[in-house]
Amino acid sequence: MNSSKEFAVVVPCSGIGKSFGAVSREAAYELCDELRPNGTRLLALAKLVLGDSEARELLAEHRTVTIDGCKQMCASKMVKQSGGTVINEVAVMDVFRRHKELKPEGIAKLNESGLKLARVLAEEVAASLDATGSSMKGSSHE
């Protein structure tokens, strides 16, 4: 099997101090820990910012999903700058627009609506991975 299809790398934004950034991270945890633990690998954006060679190698070998909390799309931009191939570029705001009843509040700890929004986002990404055949083997956090 081609190693690029063994698992998908998931890179959430690190929007510290922002509710949508917290939703991004929570959705990534939901996806990697609960929904697709055998088909995803979480990678911290900070490793790419620091130029970590193992992180860059991981991106070069596997397709990537980015989850961004704001319109700056830092996770997506950094993955592309680091040589990665983004197969799904998700913006928390786009998911929120479809689910306005799930308004996230809180930073260190999301409210119930924020957690539900993260779950909805994670489920959408999981379905996308299933459709592309990217949620097969391997799971861990980097």
Listing of model-derived features with the role each one plays in the protein:
Residues 1-46, 52-63, 73-142:
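Iron-sulfur (Fe-S) cluster-binding modules
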Residues 66-67:
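Redox-cofactor binding/interface segments in oxidoreductases and associated redox assembly factors
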Residues 70:
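Short, polar loop motifs at secondary-structure junctions
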